[in-house]
Curated annotation (Swiss-Prot):
Region Phytoene synthase, annotated ranges: 275-612
Entry annotated with the keyword Transmembrane helix: yes
Triggers of expression: Induced by light.
Listed pathway(s): Carotenoid biosynthesis; beta-carotene biosynthesis; Carotenoid biosynthesis; phytoene biosynthesis; all-trans-phytoene from geranylgeranyl diphosphate: step 1/1
Taxonomic lineage from the root: Eukaryota, Fungi, Dikarya, Ascomycota, Pezizomycotina
UniProt protein name: Bifunctional lycopene cyclase/phytoene synthase
Gene that this sequence comes from: carRA
């Protein structure tokens, strides 16, 4: 009996897992918990009970389990007998004084735990790196040569492995590794290769490379110390570096590839499920295995390419116009994230359609076109835009905005907030420096304006959260959440105005109420001419005081949101209010005339918000 192998876990694998778990815990969703707990629990069940026949029947009835099987393989009965075979035939050996002595199928308990901790660590690393990724935009109908090339590669590896095992000798261990891992890699590649090659390298190569390199180093220490060893005559004798056999290097590379490919396949199926509601009606919470199977067998020819391209356009717009919102949207999941992106893309497109018009008259015409669009969309009251609505948009709206309008989820959003948003645009067009027209006369006017341009968006976001949540939320709580969202939106708009006094002055707009200016013995022209100084700073602080007053009144309702929206909304709110806190401090970091929050401070704020 010994503790040397256990110390490998205590020194290297467990601390790594603890750090990853601590980093990802605030972002952990029900679906993430399901993936981890389900994989490890079911794997242990199979290992402890040794239900080889039952696991085979599960795979026959549930093909989607093969996706998970790639992650679980080292813990399933396809793996445990394989490990047992290696140990019984002394391909792998463990000196008697390095393990505690507990075994299953002659496999030391420490080795079984290693299978668990590797899956846990690599899975968490993948989840951390892929969290910001918006998976639906990586779906594609196209089938290229890459699929066949990958299939040939993995099939060739299987054949090479079979030949090596049948020949015995020095290629035995490498052959066993290849015939154990490559059939599942072939399967996972065949069903998800487009996703694998289309995703950013930070979602594919990086979560494979980092744990592989880490385990190569750990394995080197263990092999040098004799914690475990590979028997001569079953290995090639080639080392990647001193102390690391080539077979061990390939083994860890393939196991981490299995885990990551399996998780990518899961995300591929979830993206299909979330992106195509015409094939998969409204779903809430963790999807059933039967539903996942249906996504697996859906022909790519049935993908709605227009919907995919609409989401691609929406993401491109947000990355250009509001990267912070796009990144914040990564804390949401599934169809809720899709609809929030579609909603915000519409708001940005509508704003650009009005602001970028060549004249005030053209801007007013754009607002009327948007009103007509909303009237038609809500008159038809259907999920997918009709041919009539499409014809109106294509004939009246510039092409770059078509997708943003046609993908607005009007079917389950109220119309009034969108109408009010357009009224806010109307207010913006009333500013006229030449005639002395400045429409924000009183505090109440500013509240109304803030409610229209920001409170409406917050209200619509809350409607989407309540629509998509699997939780039952009482109607009185729903009303409170929506009303508080309106107030919070006004608070955020106050911060926005406080930040942009100089920027707005450059386009001859002054959103400070005329009543406030009169008390300070200023005119709008004074602000336009000199948008800084002690008096302006005093007015800025007055805006911020009112912003934080409304924020403090409304923030309690965030805790009453469903769990899917609580943390992400808190991050969005706190990140924006932090701009107000920076403005209150001396010497804010300025960028293009605006106060900005330093990057590390933004990270701390988001982390704190998620951990509340």
């Amino acid at each position: 009996m010994g503790w040397e192998y256990a110390q490998v876990h205590l020194k290297y694998t467990i601390p790594f897992g603890v750090v990853l778990a601590a980093v990802y815990r605030p972002l952990m969703s029900r679906l993430d918990v399901f993936k981890l707990v389900f994989l490890i629990t079911v794997s242990f069940f199979w290992v402890v009970k040794g239900l080889e026949a039952n696991s085979c029947r599960l795979l026959l009835f549930l093909p989607c389990m093969l996706i998970l099987r790639g992650v679980l393989l080292r813990l399933t009965n396809a793996d445990s007998p394989w490990d047992s075979y290696l140990i019984k035939n002394r391909i792998w050996t463990y000196p008697p004084g390095v393990v505690v002595g507990l075994t299953a199928w002659d496999i030391p308990a420490e080795e079984l735990f290693f299978f668990v901790i590797q899956t846990f660590n690599t899975s968490l690393l993948y989840m951390i790196l892929s969290k910001p990724t918006f998976h639906p935009i990586y779906l594609s109908k196209k089938t290229g040569w890459g699929k066949i090339a990958g299939q040939i590669l993995f099939a060739s590896a299987i054949i090479f492995g079979l030949v090596s095992v049948s020949s015995g000798g020095e290629g035995m261990y490498m052959g066993l590794i290849l015939i154990w891992a490559c059939p599942f890699l072939l399967f996972l590649w065949s069903i998800s290769y487009q996703f694998i090659v289309n995703l950013p390298w930070t979602n594919t190569a990086l979560p494979i490379a980092l744990p592989t390199l880490y385990l190569w180093v750990v394995d080197t220490f263990a092999l040098r110390r004799g914690t475990w060893s590979i028997t001569s005559g079953t290995k090639y004798g080639v080392v990647l570096w001193d102390g690391l056999e080539i077979e061990e290097a390939v083994f860890f590379l393939l196991t981490n590839t299995l885990i990551v490919f399996g998780l990518i396949a899961c995300d591929n199926n979830l993206a299909i499920l979330d992106t195509f509601p015409e094939h998969f009606p409204r779903t809430k919470g963790v999807p059933s295995l039967l539903t996942i199977i249906r996504t697996l067998i859906l022909p790519k020819e049935k993908y709605d390419e227009e919907r995919i391209q609409g989401l691609v356009s929406a993401v491109a717009l947000l990355r250009k116009k509001s990267r912070s919102f796009y990144l914040a949207s990564g804390t949401f999941e599934g169809r809720l994230r899709i609809d929030l992106i579609r909603l915000y893309a519409f708001c940005r497109a509508a704003d650009d359609l009005v602001d970028e018009a060549p004249s005030v008259d053209d801007s007013r015409a754009s607002i009327e076109k948007l009103r007509k669009f909303l009237d038609l969309a809500y008159e038809e009251n259907q999920e997918e835009p009709s041919q009539r609505l499409r014809e109106y948009v294509t004939s009246s709206i510039p092409e770059m905005f078509h997708m943003a309008l046609l993908q607005l989820p009007t079917y389950y959003l109220p119309k009034q907030p969108l109408d009010d948003l357009l009224k806010g645009f109307d207010t913006d067009l009333l500013f006229d420096r030449k005639s002395g027209a400045f429409p924000i006369e009183t505090t109440e006017d500013l509240d109304i304006y803030g409610s229209r341009v920001a409170g409406t968006v917050a209200e619509l976001c809350n409607h989407l959260i309540l629509y998509h949540t699997p939780e039952a939320v009482p109607e009185d709580i729903q009303r409170e959440v929506v009303a508080s969202g309106q107030e919070m939106g006004i608070a955020l708009q106050y911060v926005n105005i406080a930040r942009d006094i100089k920027t707005d002055a450059e386009i001859d707009r002054v959103y400070l109420p005329l009543s406030w200016l009169k008390e300070a013995q200023l005119t709008p022209e004074d602000v336009i001419q000199q948008p800084h100084g002690p008096t302006i700073e005093a007015l800025r602080h007055k805006l911020l005081d009112r912003a934080f007053e409304k924020y403090n009144m409304a923030k309690g309702a965030i805790d009453k949101l469903p769990s899917e929206g609580k943390g992400p909304i808190r991050v969005a709110v706190e990140s924006y209010m932090e701009i107000g806190r920076v403005l209150r401090e001396k010497g804010p970091t300025m960028k293009k005339g605006r106060a900005t929050v330093p990057k590390m401070r933004r990270i701390r704020v988001a982390w704190s918000a998620l951990n509340k």
